[in-house]
Amino acid sequence: MRRNSKERKNRATRRSQGSYQEIIGRTWIFRGAHRGRVTRRNIIWHELIGLRVRIVGSTHPAFVGIEGYVIDETRNMLVIAGDRIWKVPKDVCIFEFEADDGTKIKIPGERLVGRPEMRLKKRWKKW
């Protein structure tokens, strides 16, 4: 799209701005030093991007069995890169995250709904 003789990105609504396709196959970029601090008690407040995840239950049967790395998180969705890119709603799934030490943490998606920065401020009952 040209405007004032300058090339600009197409900012049309409902169009993806970032192409995640170039990320597939490059899982090494997700192995950061922060991954070792995830525990069963703090996963609700922790950064989910970069964690390995698998969907173990869902009200939609096509989502069950999806696995890969979380590459983006919005208020209601997780973007998971595995053999392809999946955009999965949080509230209908049960997720199983893998910590760096190999422990598997199962958590219902209803607990994860909300913007990541707002989840830090929210008070939770004992988890």
Curated annotation (Swiss-Prot):
Keyword Hydrolase: yes
UniProt-listed InterPro entries: RNase_P/MRP_Rpp29_sf, RNP1, Rof/RNase_P-like, Rpp29/RNP1
Effect on the protein of changing R75A: 40% reconstituted RNase P activity
Gene Ontology BP terms: tRNA 5'-leader removal
One of the record's GO cellular component terms: cytoplasm
GO molecular function terms attached to this record: ribonuclease P activity; RNA binding
UniProt keyword annotation of Cell division present: no
Cited function: Part of ribonuclease P (RNase P), a protein complex that generates mature tRNA molecules by cleaving their 5'-ends. Binds RNase P RNA.
Name of the protein in question: Ribonuclease P protein component 1
Name of the gene: rnp1
